[in-house]
Swiss-Prot record:
UniProt note: domains: Consists of 3 domains; the N-terminus binds the ribosome, the middle domain has PPIase activity, while the C-terminus has intrinsic chaperone activity on its own.
Gene: tig
Catalytic activity: [protein]-peptidylproline (omega=180) = [protein]-peptidylproline (omega=0)
Enzyme Commission number: 5.2.1.8
Domain PPIase FKBP-type: 163-248
Family per similarity comment: Belongs to the FKBP-type PPIase family. Tig subfamily.
UniProt-recorded name of the protein: Trigger factor
GO process terms (BP): 'de novo' cotranslational protein folding; cell division; chaperone-mediated protein folding; protein transport; protein unfolding
Function: Involved in protein export. Acts as a chaperone by maintaining the newly synthesized protein in an open conformation. Functions as a peptidyl-prolyl cis-trans isomerase.
Gene Ontology CC annotations of this record: cytoplasm
Domain of life: Bacteria
UniProt keywords, alphabetically: Cell cycle, Cell division, Chaperone, Cytoplasm, Isomerase, Rotamase
Main location: cytoplasm
Length: 427
């Protein structure tokens, strides 16, 4: 294989390489043996057409496209490796020549990884809003949330207040004409919940069971039913019941109802404090990591970040997101229909974050290279075992899905993130 690379501009160039006859000839044989099975030619049994007759009738060149399609991926990868390039986007391939009996010449317009000039990335001083401290108020709020989950709705005498639940019948009309979806019976509505259009719930506050209330509202301009958007409506509303939330007493019995592993309220508070401390420590560490990486990127210089890298990251993120939706039974078409968005909208949404992630990845990879970080066999095996445990898969299955090079890269990058983060201090 002959390989050459000509730089055209920063991070771009043309890779020229050849595919030799030593690879072409056996592939020609394989392709011919495959296609001849489907050829019907008078005087010859199907699948038994001699090569010479095929060449005379169709020309050997008829096989070339299938041959080059089969050989090109591996030949391109080998050429990239031989030229010592780090290609970061899909190449534009052009077959320059496919002469019979000659080596074939291919060119690939490639985008290469930009140079990263590292600045300071160790011992960085960062500011974060997150804190590890857990206050009594936070513990109390967690208990209060659990307490409210055990609350019951009880019939209330007198007028409804914000936070109460009313059971209602309602009939909606516009200019005296009822409309589809504007009627309901024995509907439980939390006042202040925002379940109904703005202004509806507030007009029921102060009214008691047995009362009939004329609720006048205007549908929002962006209301999902276009025929109702922006229109004034009247809802004749009958209140059947008013219910108030009754929360259990704040005592040891409540603590046991919330968590069967504790006996007293003090034990529950101690347990909740420990849980909050653990979660806040994770959040604090994440905030420090994010701030340190951001500062390391700011301190570095990336020489002309190619747009193709950002687009590749956007497409990766979109495919990952839509793949997650599909696992929940929502196809891409269904998602776009439900949300009223397009793939282009998603592209714009992910673009800013994609640029930030791309820059961060480049800087972290440069740090890994500068520090000489590599992955040991033991670290690779542990990474595979951890992934298998995380995704509930067999170790052998994970090993078959991930290339050793990918694992080595990921481990080296983790070490780079660790050296940036662990040496950072919080101002």
């Amino acid at each position: 294989m002959s390989v050459s690379f000509e730089a055209k501009e920063t991070n771009r160039g043309v890779l020229t390489f050849t595919i030799g006859q030593d690879a072409i000839k056996p592939e020609l044989d394989r392709v011919f043996n495959k296609v001849k099975k489907d050829i019907n030619l008078p005087g010859f049994r199907k699948g038994h057409l001699p090569r010479a007759v095929f060449n005379q009738k169709f020309g050997e060149e008829a096989l070339y496209q299938d041959v080059v399609n089969a050989l090109l991926p591996a030949a391109y990868e080998a050429a990239v490796a031989e030229a010592g390039l780090e290609v970061v986007a899909q190449p534009k391939i052009d077959v320059v020549s496919m002469e019979k009996g000659q080596d074939w010449t291919i060119t690939a317009e490639v985008v290469t990884k930009p140079e990263v000039k590292l600045g300071d990335y160790k011992n960085l001083a960062v500011s974060v809003e997150a804190t590890k401290e857990v206050t009594d108020e936070e513990v109390d709020a967690k208990i209060e949330a659990a307490r409210n989950n055990l609350a019951e709705l009880v019939i209330k005498e007198g007028p409804a207040a914000e936070g109460d639940t009313v059971v209602i019948d309602f009939v909606g009309s516009i200019d005296g004409v009822e409309f589809d979806g504007g009627k309901g019976e024995n509907f439980s509505l939390g006042l202040g919940s925002g379940q109904f259009i703005p202004g509806f719930e507030a007009q029921l506050v102060g009214h008691a069971a047995g009362e009939e209330v004329n609720v006048e509202v205007t549908f929002p301009e962006d209301y999902q039913a276009a025929d109702l958007a922006g229109k004034q409506a009247l809802f004749v509303t009958k209140i059947h019941e008013v219910k108030a939330k009754e929360v259990p007493a704040l005592d040891d019995e409540l603590a046991k109802d919330i968590d069967e592993e504790v006996e007293t309220l003090d034990e529950l508070k101690a347990k909740y404090r420990k849980e909050l401390e653990a979660s806040k420590e994770v959040a604090f560490d994440d905030a420090v990591e994010s701030a340190a990486l951001e500062l390391a990127v700011e301190n570095a210089e990336i020489v002309e970040l190619p747009e193709e890298m950002i687009h590749e990251e956007v497409h990766r993120a979109i495919n990952e997101f839509l793949g997650g939706m599909q696992q929940q039974g929502i196809s891409p078409d269904m998602y776009f229909q439900i949300t009223g968005t397009t793939r282009e909208d998603l592209h714009k949404q992910y673009e800013a974050d994609a640029e930030k992630r791309t820059k961060t990845n480049l800087v972290v990879e440069a740090v890994a290279k500068a520090e000489g970080f590599e992955a040991t066999e033991e670290e690779i095996n542990k990474e595979i075992e951890d992934l298998a445990a995380t995704y509930n898969m067999e170790v052998a299955q994970v090993r078959s899905l991930l290339s050793p090079e990918m694992l080595k890269h990921d481990i080296a990058v983790k070490k780079a993130v660790e050296v940036i983060t662990s040496t950072a201090t919080v101002k």
